[in-house]
Amino acid sequence: TIIPWLKDRVNMVLFSQTIRTTGIPESKLIEVISSPIKSDHDCEIGYYPSIFGVDIRISSKRKENIQSLQNQITALLGKTVFALGDDSIEEIVVKKALENEISLSIAESCTGGLIGHRITQISGSSKIFKGGVVVYSNSSKVNLLGVGENCINEYGAVSEETAKEMAERVRVMFSSELGLSITGIAGPSGGSKEKPVGLTYIGLSTKQQTKVQKFQFGSIRSSNKLRASQAALNWMRLEVSNV
């Protein structure tokens, strides 16, 4: 009956661990770990997706079982795992930047300062975050940041070339080790066939090189800003962690 089962559950001491991931959809995550993981691990696995990623929660009566399964899952998921426990991705960025003494600066367009806001929510960020600029209009990209007017005229504000210049310019402006830029079409209007709503470019510049990644998010403005900020922070995490 249900009553003895409930009594057992009430008196049971459960251990748990959370594995935080980002940049991988829930369906893909389950596909990656379900086949290699055997079913006799005596643990319960729960998946909790959000706009920022997927949290995996492992629960068991035996702590050693959790540790074993955690090691297997983190090995399978690799770089998509950003934390064990409750730390946010911005907490990890600040922690790793402090550990490795890497200073940061950010030039934001479509996210409107959200990335800088998330970083400065973390205590100690003032030691590594040199500053940021919100260059929302084309004129501010040119006049404030120093992006070439020819670059914007030829390729557009939302382009790999503009994101590259933005990242390089902001790094030099603040004399930081790492400069990050983001430019995109948040929506719901402003898109085209060639450049649809949700198209976003993120640039990352160091003294050695500048790289740009292209992302295609959805059609909802608020979601696009959150997802874009998470993608930017994740790339920053990988860079400051020397992964």
Predicted stretch roles:
Residues 10-13, 52-54, 74-75, 145-147:
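Short acidic (Asp/Glu) and glycine-rich catalytic loops that position anionic groups and cofactors
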Residues 57-59, 203:
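Beta-strand residues in well-ordered beta-sheet regions across diverse protein folds
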Residues 64-243:
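Short alpha-helical segments enriched in small residues
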